[in-house]
């Protein structure tokens, strides 16, 4: 089994075990190991695989799934300019604190700045607009990588051979676990007047519908919401 196959399988298996169900894939050449791993996982009914050819649209599609589910949604692309198409969705995920996981395939580090076909400097490409940025050619512990919120970038270096014939059943014995839930900071609000209104912005700031309704009822205030509760 090649190092690229090992890296792809470890990454996808860990994400499945962390309870991630939806994956958005834009197929390409360098991310072929990830594509094969995802198709195999989908064939076993372990994930929901959404294929979108356009990377910009794929990233916003993943953003929408994350907003609906509250879970991290990986969006996967090949190397080169494909990665740059994620930036608009990354900005929105950053400012809205949406859990978007960017899995970008890359060539090995030794080919950077050499004039080799298609490499660009993908590591750190999203700057301060991601809450974590990782550049690796070997498997890493994703439970710590995703112990946060908002967009996270993992740049995966895949070397040749990208595809090998291997019939190993690498998806047996899946042990599901959950990502740790973030604790919200609580505060006490005492209205100074009886004429109050509760305005709920986009994404509810992470609060559950029941929490919002309970708070509004406790102060006798009407609710004005941007989205349906």
Spell out what each predicted region is.
Residues 2-229:
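N-terminal alpha/beta PP-like core and its mobile active-site loop of ThDP/TPP-dependent enzymes
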